[in-house]
Every structure is written in C-alpha cells, then in structure tokens.
Amino acid sequence: MDTLVMENSAPAQAASSPEFLFTSGQGTLSATDWASLITTPACEWPLLEQQIASALAAARPAGQANPLLIGCLRVRPGGSSCLYVPAAMSGDRPVPAAQAPVTAAMANQVVEANRVISVQSTPPASEFQASVSAALDAFAQGRLAKVVLSRKLTLTLHQPADPTQVMARLMAQNPHAFHFSLPLGQGRRLLGASPELLLRVSEGEVFTHPLARSARRASEPAQEQMVARDLLASRKDQHEHKLVIDEIRRVLTPHCRELAIPSSPSLMSTDTLWHLGTPIAGRLNGGEASVLSLACQLHPTPALCGYPTELARQFIREQEPFRRALFSGIVGWCDSQGNGEWAVVIRCGVLDGHQVELFAGAGIVAGSDPPWSGPRPGTKLGTMLKALGLDLEVAQ
C-alpha cells in the first residue's frame, strides 16, 4: 500500500509542479507550489488523519494562519491519493469567480482539431454485458440491491492533448460544474468537470447534493420535456435514488443537530444529461468532525459504488478488469478548521501525452437492461470528448 508524506525540500519527479485548480460556485482555488504531498488512501483514515494534521501544522510556521489541503483523495484500497499542502496561498478560501481572471481567459481558448489513432474499450461490450447479467442474478438472489459498473476508454491521439486548452473547454461548456485539474506525476494530469458535490462544510453548516439516475437530454423542446418528466416519474429511478438518500441520512444524522432532506428528488441538468438530485442541508453538532472525515464516511455513496456498500465493492473487484484509480474518488480542499468542499471525481479523464484515459459508470438495479442502464456510455464520456474536440461516436 502506498502511503507517503513528502516534504518539498527534496522534490521527486512524481510530485513536481502541482499547478492545482479547483472551481465551484463558491469560487476558484489554485496553487503552483507545494510544501507536503500525502498519498495515503481514505481507507486508511486514522493514518491519513494524522498525516493531514501534521502537514497542516507544519505549514503554520511558514506564515499560513489557516493552512489548506488540496487535491484528490482515493477512497478504495490498492492505490494512492494525491493531496497537497500548498507552500503559499493568496488566502485561505477560494477566490470568488468574478475575481478569478484565469476563468475568463481560459474559456476563450479553442481546442485545436485532433485525430484519434486508436480506441480501446475496457471491458469490451460483451464482457460488460456479462457483468450486468451477473449483477442481475445477484439482485434476484437478494445479495445486492445496486451496483455501479464502469468502463474505461483509452484513446491514442495524433497530437498530445493540451491540458490548458482542454480545461478551458471544460469550463466554457460546463460553467456550473466543479472543475478540477491536478498533476499525477510523470507528465500525467487528471482533469474534469463534475456535476456532483459530495460535501461542503462552512462554519458548521453542511450541504450535499447527491445525484443518482440520469437521462440523456433531447434536442427538441417537446421531447426534452418528455425525457425530464419520464425520469422524474420512473419508479425504478426513484428507487435507486432513494437508496442513495437513505444512506446519506444514516451517515449524517448522528453528526447533525439539524438536517433538512426533501421528501422527493428534483431535476438537475448538465449540457448532456438530466439528473435526479436531492439538496440536503444541515447544521453540525458543536465541535463535530471535519469536512474530510465526514466525506470519507459518506463516500462512496450508493451512487458511485452500490448497496450494500461492502458487497458492491467486492462485486466490482471481481467484475471490473481495471483499477479505477482516482476515478470515483473525491477532489477539492479543506482547511485546518474543518471547512472545505469536495466533489465526486466523475466526467473526467487522465491526459498523458498522446494517450487519454476516460471513464464512465452505470448504476445497475433490478430491472436494468444490459448492456447499459440509463444513458449510453458515450453520453457520460461526452463531457470530456467535447472538451478534447472529439466526436461522441468515438465512444460508441
């Protein structure tokens, strides 16, 4: 298991030039230098909590009254997180978007046309269909209620993808998303535009907005209304969404003196999809846990893994032929006072020179039809494909 706290006095190639960027409706946070790197996954929380506390404490003598931790946290075992304590920040909060000139400047850039040399889907469609069938058998036997199976698409491009240009397109095409870009070492970079907030904590107030079940948007207004109406009325989709909400209620209730959860979900849209979402707000008990400790208790929700969680994890390990790495982890920031904001790592990709890895997941419940439940995989991959200047047909 990779666990590491590295000081920047002896930087390694795998952690040089962080150039981290995270944006949300709360503002923009960026950093270009680091004091510490932590790679421990969330499944080792006692060790991770100790390492974070030590790294934040070490940043105070350098002049940071309220140091920040930024980056991406891997939730599942078998791989590394990528968490940084910046060496210096202009403040201890995200800068409001209106004050962040990088946003407007990047959005005006254009991605140059590129050409796909090869495409590899992992797993192939036939193997994915077999995994869905195995999941349906597990549901029928009462062993599982839901599982989320994912697909990786590996593209080889004629020209290397420019991370700055791709990020500009992501921000322009998905202005209300949670945008993120961070280095993974050896020239690799994770970036994306997630529609889903896992958790935000600010001065004792907690907020989460889980998304579960989706449908592809239509180009015609009449059909668009029908798609949205059918999603909101679907018993199967409502059932799957309720699994997520019930689990979040179970986790948050002991930590909150107030917790407001709507009785039914509402519709939320991105540029390609309609989602069922439920905004949940509350107030933490006095002296309660930090945003990151709560996030690690919440994640992975049934929307990212399945239910029951441990059985779904085991099923995924048995069926998926690749490691998800940081895909389906969480990305964001927290400060030394327990405040912060973390989004789910979806609608994302890893850029590595001429090669790009894209990821998409599908929630499977009883009644799902192989090979995919809900939108086609190309629809969820469409966020990154559009930012890369590629056609959606690449993913079909």
Curated annotation (Swiss-Prot):
GO terms for molecular function: isochorismate synthase activity. Its EC number is 5.4.4.2. Pfam families: Chorismate_bind. It catalyses: chorismate = isochorismate. GO terms for biological process: biosynthetic process. Gene3D superfamilies: Anthranilate synthase. Pathway: Siderophore biosynthesis; amonabactin biosynthesis. InterPro entries: ADC_synthase, Chorismate_C, IsoChor_synthase. Keywords: Isomerase. Involved in the synthesis of amonabactin, a phenolate siderophore containing 2,3-dihydroxybenzoic acid (2,3-DHB). Belongs to the isochorismate synthase family. This is Putative isochorismate synthase. The lineage of its organism: Bacteria, Pseudomonadati, Pseudomonadota, Gammaproteobacteria, Aeromonadales.
